[in-house]
Amino acid sequence: MERYQMLHNAKYIPGQIVRHSRFDYRGVIIDVDPTFQGTEDWYNEVAQSRPPKDHPWYHVLVDEQDAVTYVAERHLDADADSSPITHPMLEAFLGARRDDGTYAPLHTMN
């Protein structure tokens, strides 16, 4: 129940298009972790701004690249751009695009 409550408090959901506020790239969320699930080494090396580990973190397919990023919630904003996401792995995680611009998740990863 605690994990469900923590995910319920996440600001974004799988299939939602977001923009990274620091690095200004678009992407689509494919999974949500209620708290940081990476290693200490990764956090110390990559998460230079030291975002909180006790808030949601998101797995994001980066638009027009073949990258997948792991991003703290505080670095994401909902994206107002309504254009579709282009990513080679999009169809492995997400289905049809909905009328509201989000994508239908094919399955829940967590």
Write out the residue ranges for each language-model feature.
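Intrinsically disordered, low-complexity boundary segments flanking structured domains
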Residues: Q16, N44-S49
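Short, solvent-exposed secondary-structure boundary/capping segments
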Residues: F36-E45
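A short beta-strand motif that forms part of the nucleic acid-binding face
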Residues: D31-P34, E64
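Intrinsically disordered, low-complexity, charged/polar segments
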Residues: R50-N110
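Mixed-charge, Lys/Arg-rich low-complexity intrinsically disordered regions
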Residues: M1-I17, R22-R26, D33-F36, L106-N110
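Short, glycine/acidic-enriched capping/hinge loops at junctions between secondary-structure elements
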Residues: I30-D31, E40
